[in-house]
Amino acid sequence: MTKHGKRIRGILKNYDFSKSYSLREAIDILKQCPPVRFDQTVDVSIKLGIDPKKSDQQIRGAVFLPNGTGKTLRILVFASGNKVKEAVEAGADFMGSDDLVEKIKSGWLEFDVAVATPDMMREVGKLGKVLGPRNLMPTPKTGTVTTDVAKAISELRKGKIEFKADRAGVCNVGVGKLSFESSQIKENIEALSSALIKAKPPAAKGQYLVSFTISSTMGPGISIDTRELMAS
């Protein structure tokens, strides 16, 4: 049997595809999967009971993961004047104004998150078709459009992440690394689920957390019992 086949067989020993697990059980299953040569990202995919086509049922926000993401972010700041210096001193990786806008228009996207000062949004808004689908567009709702550039950068470095429901009403979010302690992964997921529950639109009816799946980069997608998350 090939190495790939052996890996799949090893995963299936610990996992029943037809079952929903507690959060702790699911994390343990991911950790018991045959190892790979890199530190895998732990992702969650949450199907929400919303109609994202309606403006009053769109979900977007930000939350602090108490244990961070385990990822070194490449932070870009759209700014001019003294705010460029502030961005440099705060540790931004890329900063600029019209020059960055033009660079992104030409296809460059080597960054993970963007911050912008309000005066830059007229130009940054022209990048909507590029940044929007990639969830890279700065927005006041998540604190990435701000005059306090240093604070925004500091929060991102400390584990602040954005979440957004796509056109199918699904949020896909990285919540840490598989090398984290199980308790750290669990705490991060609970922080995210709590933020999502608080962000429930008043117009959304019926079951809100329709499904909740946790996976690692090379591991299976494991269904979580949503009742645990609603109660936490």
Swiss-Prot record:
PROSITE patterns: RIBOSOMAL_L1 (PS01199)
Signal peptide: none
CDD domains tied to this protein: Ribosomal_L1 (cd00403)
Cellular component annotations (GO), alphabetically ordered: large ribosomal subunit
InterPro entries (UniProt xref): Ribosom_uL1_bac-type, Ribosomal_uL1, Ribosomal_uL1-like, Ribosomal_uL1/biogenesis, Ribosomal_uL1_3-a/b-sand, Ribosomal_uL1_CS
Keyword Nuclease: no
Top-rank taxon: Bacteria
Family per similarity comment: Belongs to the universal ribosomal protein uL1 family.
Subunit record text: Part of the 50S ribosomal subunit.
Protein name (Swiss-Prot/TrEMBL): Large ribosomal subunit protein uL1
Encoding gene, per UniProt annotation: rplA
